[in-house]
């Protein structure tokens, strides 16, 4: 086991919508795929046509999608089905990385303010089932800041399951200032599905919901001024060029109008879908205002975006406008939107796990057997 502690650590970015895995020190993850498990929903009539009862990875996400009932084991950053989570991790090791789990320490990412039980079970499975030699868990947003080359800033990380704002100053997180809302990309997909149904386009199976996710990624945008945009649509003055056309897998064409900006609007106004959460702009300002007065100016001038939902067209511009409305007058606000922000959590993990000092940060399997609570006392 001592030898395995010297091998390159594996960075496992365990996202609610996408899992990314690879070796520390690499520039990009070696494998990434939607973090769902697919099971055949029809009776098998041809022996040997499809081997296995469970399908994971790119094959399940593309060519077999229509045959499968799809389930995500992670909801809002919390694992709701550990059996399926274990299957996904096994697939990562066997097919994605083609390596043995017991030969590499692991850096596992997680959202902030997650239940302790989630980390306990993750550690138990990785140590007991996969026999990993050592484990370290890190908050996703902090890793995104490392990837941007900064040690000070507030990261707004909005992925598929969770959106959170995390202030970091000179490499230290300010725990009492972290803000989290369980509104993110999957909620946008579900709301778009509802809006399309009202327009006469019905997507009801779990596989068709994946099609809606692809539509969302392709055509949605965040309106700079949603009220003005709504008025233009109501008055039918909207430029026909604003109507997007999307070709469905069966060749039919879908015309999408105001749904394009109405769906992602829930990130800024979750009350649209009946959720009593503040918007993403509000959690950024709240998290900064909870820090010491001396830190705020530096944080406002270093707002870093991370996660797939921030890639929505117009997101950064709208965020800047909304933060300016809430911030102190004449405050200098700068938002950084790294082009690789879909992977920035993984990249930050690769940087951190590649440092020689990383060995001092992790918990070895022996330490964990002696005291399982060490994963809470040693990691923030």
Swiss-Prot record:
GO terms assigned for molecular function: ATP binding
Record key words, sorted: ATP-binding, Cytoplasm, Cytoskeleton, Nucleotide-binding
Primary site of residence: cytoplasm
Keyword Lipid biosynthesis: no
Localization (cell): Cytoplasm, Cytoskeleton
SUPFAM superfamilies: Actin-like ATPase domain
SMART domains: ACTIN
Entry superkingdom: Eukaryota
This protein's record includes keyword DNA-binding: no
Cellular component aspect of the GO annotation: cytoplasm; dynactin complex
CDD domains assigned: ASKHA_NBD_Arp1
Function: Involved in nuclear migration. May function as a component of the dynactin complex which activates force generation by cytoplasmic dynein.
Membership in a protein family: Belongs to the actin family. ARP1 subfamily.
Protein's UniProt name: Actin-like protein
Organism annotation: Neurospora crassa (strain ATCC 24698 / 74-OR23-1A / CBS 708.71 / DSM 1257 / FGSC 987)
Lineage, broadest ranks: Eukaryota, Fungi, Dikarya, Ascomycota, Pezizomycotina
Primary gene name: ro-4
